[in-house]
Amino acid sequence: RIVFIKINPEIAIAEIDKKTKQKKYNWNIEIKNYLSDLGYIKLKDNLNFEAKFPKYNGILHLKKFDLKTLDKNTRNKINKAKNKGLNFEKASFNELPILYEFIKRKKEKSLTYYQEYFKVFDRTAIDLFLVSLDTAEFLNNAKKLYDEELKKNSELVANLNKMKNEKKLNLKMNSDQKLLNYKNYLLEAQNKIKKSEKIYIGGALVLKYKNRINIIISGYDQNYKRFNPNYLLHYEIFNYYKKNYAFADMNGITGDFKKENPYYGLNKFKLGFKPKIYEFIGEYDLPIFPFLYKWNLKNGKLAKRLNRKNLKKTVLN
């Protein structure tokens, strides 16, 4: 039995100024009243990711996309990634297990889920991209990091011998840990070269529809975060599609732009590509059987089925 219908219309009600973060509302906001008159129940404003779908999003105009227009920090990270030997490549269905290793902790979905998801769409409608690390460049980088830290460590040992204190001891211990990490990187790089293995460190699934693309999900190996794979991945994706598509959907941001926001890093990353920021009308439920809807909501059954722990709290009375 259908208890209710959920909608999440792609109707932008405001554009948000990139600098001031002030909202400029348009006439679409009146649609809220029409929906209410029709019996739709508005869910509480989704400032972060409390609801099933994000209420705020960045839309990138691909025709205007250029490295020079990006945030300075974003440009620097992209250029560093290029200099560190990262490679961007289009992959096939058979490489989905590689991507899955980078995204399996983001959502409680199995590899089979993504494989079936991939098969649902026409082959021309969905793409898989991967970022790999050149093993020779990785070896050079690992050796450089190790040698630099070894030099620092020797200096810390000399200073510690002259005068011991807690601060110097902590610095030495931190340096020891870094040395161990860099040594492991070095050994890993040497083993990869011996086995002629490619090191994949990031990837994304992209859906194409009409004049736009949507990055469905992306991820990267945290062990290689210093190589900035996520920055290069998104930059190359936008470049890849800019000739044939007009817009790129950034797949959601939060409406809280304060540094204290736990999602501040995510916002900063996505907004560094200079998309236009929009607030959308949000989610609405249309109860078909109001009594059953309220009963299921009160008992938490809707939250369980929709996998939303705080659903009961997000509905306005």
Language-model segments: residues:
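Conserved acetyl-CoA-binding loop-helix of GNAT-fold acetyltransferases
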Residues: R1, K225-N239
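Conserved GNAT acetyl-CoA-binding A-motif
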Residues: I2-K18, Y241-T254
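Flexible, glycine-rich phosphate/dinucleotide-binding loops
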Residues: A14, E137-F138, F257
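Active-site/acyl-donor-binding loops of N-acyltransferases
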Residues: K18-I29, L35-F65, F247-N317
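A conserved beta-strand-loop-helix scaffold within acyl/acetyltransferase catalytic domains
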Residues: N26, L38-K225
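Aromatic/hydrophobic pocket-lining residues that form π-stacking "cages" and hydrophobic walls in ligand
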Residues: K77, I237, L266
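Short, contiguous acidic/charged loop-to-helix segments that flank catalytic cores in large enzymes
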Residues: G219-N228, T254-N261
